[in-house]
């Protein structure tokens, strides 16, 4: 399965264009082949470029968010971007050292953990073969974290409020100073009492136990676009876990797995099937009814059709994802059935045909006739 582009760039799914651009520039400098000579760096650089190529454009990003790689598989190639405005390498060092405490008494500013976006969820959904082709509405059931209705997500008992954390004084972080022969170092870490929120709950909500969220099942109706296939990913916005401390909810990602069909085989937007006809139908030609995903349709078998010939029924394949008006084709492989036993009258007639054609019949049979007709 292809790597997630957001994870490749190290950004959240709701990151804005500037955040994506900054992350891309930082990683591009790190893995650029002229700078990084380690094995695999060039491949990583190409992956980063591809991720930025997709996520930097609103249209391709929207398709990727809804369908995953399948929605952008035709959107350009993993080429290089313009690095003319990348500037110097100074911010690389800022990235390296910005997370550490200061030296010689200088300290990083404390940050309280604010609203946090809820976690994204994944649901694997098995689809019927024809449902994947034509799409439609599907009801699913998910279990996710919902904001507690009693405390409205605060985690505190009714009539009470969270209080300032006594461990960190509301900063959400604690500092520990260490003296060494090289100077003083300050280590900053998340407060273990309030877990970075800066607040602690003394009287916890009876329903959620102070968590601010409750795990609940939920039924959803989602729209399956026509033309999806195994591996297609659908994004259902805001149906992941509820956020913390007033943060937005995450998203639900539905990964589709399509069942196989007994009549048809699928490759992309084309369908394949097999039809068996008699040797006389192959020689003389005929019109017969064949099955399609839309229902029966007429197929013309031309005279002299050879075994394993492939005939095309246009427009009876799979709708193109994102453009259901455009459809693939149904390709029908023709199998010719040669009888193992024939009546005396049929044999007599066939032997006359052999004489007319001048074919040489095998001993006790008319193999030469069939070889002459079908090129065997």
From Swiss-Prot:
Pfam families: DnaJ, DnaJ_C, DnaJ_CXXCXGXG. CDD domains: DnaJ, DnaJ_C, DnaJ_zf. GO terms for molecular function: ATP binding; heat shock protein binding; unfolded protein binding; zinc ion binding. Residues 4-68 form the J domain. Its cofactor is Zn(2+). SMART domains: DnaJ. Belongs to the DnaJ family. GO terms for cellular component: cytoplasm. Zn(2+) 1 binds at residues 148, 151, 205, 208. The J domain is necessary and sufficient to stimulate DnaK ATPase activity. Zinc center 1 plays an important role in the autonomous, DnaK-independent chaperone activity of DnaJ. Zinc center 2 is essential for interaction with DnaK and for DnaJ activity. This is Chaperone protein DnaJ. It is found in: Cytoplasm. InterPro entries: DnaJ, DnaJ_C, DnaJ_domain, HSP40/DnaJ_pept-bd, HSP_DnaJ_Cys-rich_dom, HSP_DnaJ_Cys-rich_dom_sf, J_dom_sf. It comes from Synechococcus sp. (strain ATCC 27144 / PCC 6301 / SAUG 1402/1) (Anacystis nidulans). Binds 2 Zn(2+) ions per monomer. It comes from the Bacteria. One of its GO terms (biological process) is protein refolding. The lineage of its organism: Bacteria, Bacillati, Cyanobacteriota, Cyanophyceae, Synechococcales. CXXCXGXG motif repeats lie at residues 148-155, 165-172, 191-198, 205-212. Participates actively in the response to hyperosmotic and heat shock by preventing the aggregation of stress-denatured proteins and by disaggregating proteins, also in an autonomous, DnaK-independent fashion. Unfolded proteins bind initially to DnaJ; upon interaction with the DnaJ-bound protein, DnaK hydrolyzes its bound ATP, resulting in the formation of a stable complex. GrpE releases ADP from DnaK; ATP binding to DnaK triggers the release of the substrate protein, thus completing the reaction cycle. Keywords: Chaperone, Cytoplasm, DNA replication, Metal-binding, Repeat, Stress response, Zinc, Zinc-finger. Zn(2+) 2 binds at residues 165, 168, 191, 194. Homodimer. A zinc finger (CR-type) spans 135-217.
């Amino acid at each position: 399965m292809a790597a997630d582009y957001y994870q490749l760039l190290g950004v959240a799914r709701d990151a804005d264009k500037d955040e994506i651009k900054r992350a891309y520039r930082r990683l591009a400098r790190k893995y650029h082949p002229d700078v990084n000579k380690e094995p695999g760096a060039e491949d990583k650089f190409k992956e980063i470029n591809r991720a930025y190529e997709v996520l930097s454009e609103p249209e391709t990003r929207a398709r990727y968010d809804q369908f995953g790689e399948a929605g952008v598989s035709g959107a350009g190639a993993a080429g290089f971007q313009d690095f003319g405005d990348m500037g110097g390498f100074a911010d690389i060092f800022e990235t390296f050292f910005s997370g550490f405490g200061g030296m010689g008494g200088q300290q990083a500013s404390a940050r309280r953990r604010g609203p946090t976006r809820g976690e994204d969820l994944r649901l694997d959904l098995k689809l019927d073969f024809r449902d994947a082709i034509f799409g439609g509405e599907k009801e699913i059931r998910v279990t996710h974290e919902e904001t507690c209705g009693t405390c409205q997500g605060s985690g505190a008992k009714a009539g009470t409020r969270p209080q300032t954390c006594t461990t960190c004084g509301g900063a959400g972080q604690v500092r520990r100073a260490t003296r060494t022969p090289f100077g003083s170092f300050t280590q900053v870490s998340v407060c273990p009492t309030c877990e970075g929120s800066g607040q602690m709950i003394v009287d916890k909500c009876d329903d959620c136990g102070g968590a601010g969220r409750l795990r609940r099942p939920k039924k959803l109706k989602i729209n399956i676009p026509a033309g999806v296939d195994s591996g297609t990913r659908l994004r259902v916005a805001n149906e992941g876990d509820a956020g913390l401390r007033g943060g937005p909810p995450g998203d639900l990602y539905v990964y589709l797995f399509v069942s196989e069909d007994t009549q048809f085989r699928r490759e992309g937007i084309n369908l394949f099937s097999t039809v068996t006809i008699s040797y006389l139908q192959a020689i003389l030609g005929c019109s017969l009814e064949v099955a399609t995903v839309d229902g029966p349709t007429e197929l013309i078998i031309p005279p002299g059709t050879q075994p394993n010939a492939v005939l095309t029924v246009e427009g009876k394949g799979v709708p193109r994802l994102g453009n259901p008006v455009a459809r693939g084709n149904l390709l029908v492989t023709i199998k010719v059935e040669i009888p193992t036993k024939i009546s005396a009258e049929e044999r007599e007639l066939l032997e006359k045909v052999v004489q007319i054609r001048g074919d040489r019949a095998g001993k006790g049979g008319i193999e030469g006739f069939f070889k002459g007709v079908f090129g065997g």
